[in-house]
Amino acid sequence: MSSTPKVLRGCCGIGLWALLLTPTWASWQDAVPGAQIIGTGDFSVFGFDVYNARLWSAARPLADGQPFALELIYRRSVSREDLVKASVDEIKRLAGSSISPAQLAVWQAQMQQSFVDVQAGTRITGVYLPGQGARFFVGQQLQHEINDPLFAQAFFNIWLDPRTRNPELRQQLLGTAKP
C-alpha cells in the first residue's frame, strides 16, 4: 500500500491547523472595518522624502474612541533602531515626566519587536485599538501586538497630538489642511 495518502493527510492536517490558528485579524483592515482614507501627507527631513503617511478610519472626521490605522509607506531605507529611537524620543518629548524611564524601556523593547528595517516601498501600518493597544503590520502581515492602551495613545500622539513636530502633516492626515 502506498504511503502517499498518509503524507497527504499529514500535509492537509498541518494546513488546517495553520488556518485555524490564523487570527481573525489577519490584516489591518479586519481591525478597522469600513476604513476609508481620512487624509494623506508626506514626511521629509532636510528635503529628503522619508515616507508617505495615510490615516484610515471608518469615522470621518476621526472620532475619539474609534479604531484607526496609520499607514507609512517608506521612500528610503531606515533601520529598525533608528525608527525605535525616533519614536522613543518623540514619546518622551510629548509625554514629559508622565512616562517613567522604566516604562519607556518596556515600550522600546515592544517597538523593537513591532518594527523592521525598512527599504523604499516597505509599508508599516499601525492600528490604534481604543482601550486595548496597538497592532503593527508589515505589508499585510501582523508583525507584533502591544496590549497597552497607554502605549497606543503615546505612540499615535507622535503624529496626531497638536504638539507634534509636523503640524502640517497632522492637518493633512486629519483632513483639515487648507488648500
Which ranges hold each PLM region?
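N-terminal compositionally biased, intrinsically disordered segments and leader/signal-like regions
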Residues: P5, P23-W25
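Terminal leader/tail segments of proteins
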Residues: W25-P179
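Bacterial N-terminal signal peptides
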Residues: C11-P23
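Bacterial N-terminal signal peptides that target proteins for export
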Residues: S2-I14
